């Protein structure tokens, strides 16, 4: 009965809980808001969810990457514009993701055309946002709580989010577990989290394509597929992240010059 309710965790589920908790603790004690945002977009949780789910990368993975972008903007708008407290804002963002993912899961065709089309859409949106969005550095902040309180709290939240993993199917790999933790830890600088997501939309689809065809055409082991995906993602993400930092610095310098 517990297994049917998704309360049964396999080994890879526990490994995913550990990895997301570790990244969550890192984001909680890191003052740099841009580093917090990086923690939300590196695909370590995504990769371990891929191992745990055991499904090839497909259209659902690419769609859920874009849904993560919608999630962070929903949280930002609800918290900053509508003035809803951060925890209800995160809950509403997650409810949107789960509802949309659950509705799309049975109707999204897992065809090559759909997969490649969504990847192209994600990449295009990522490039446009990266070029057009406004840049500035956010508020530096780290949690005042001691780690022996913060770490178990994060682990409890992550474990609760894992309960719905199997419900999401392929959408699970980009389910915003890490983004939800970082949204709370970055509640004073949600703009940084939003500015970081286009980098994932640029690098993620290329990683998804590589991983799909390494698995379906070459029939490589999931771990080898994942490591190859990580390597390609890092080659794309790292220079983009360096450019993002430079743009933030230039925007801050320009703003300081205007004030003088």
Predicted regions and their residues:
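N-terminal signal-anchor module of multipass membrane proteins
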Residues: 1-33, 37
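Cytoplasmic-side transmembrane-helix entry/capping segments in multi-pass membrane proteins
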Residues: 36-42, 83-95, 114-118, 139-149, ...
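Membrane-interface helix-loop-helix junctions at boundaries between adjacent transmembrane segments
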Residues: 55-116
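C-terminal ends of transmembrane helices
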Residues: 21-31, 70-84, 127-137, 181-191, ...
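Structural signature of hydrophobic alpha-helical transmembrane segments
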Residues: 5-17, 51-70, 112-122, 165-176
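Hydrophobic alpha-helical transmembrane segments in multi-pass integral membrane proteins
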Residues: 101-109, 154-167, 206-223
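Selected transmembrane alpha-helices and immediately adjacent juxtamembrane segments
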Residues: 132-168
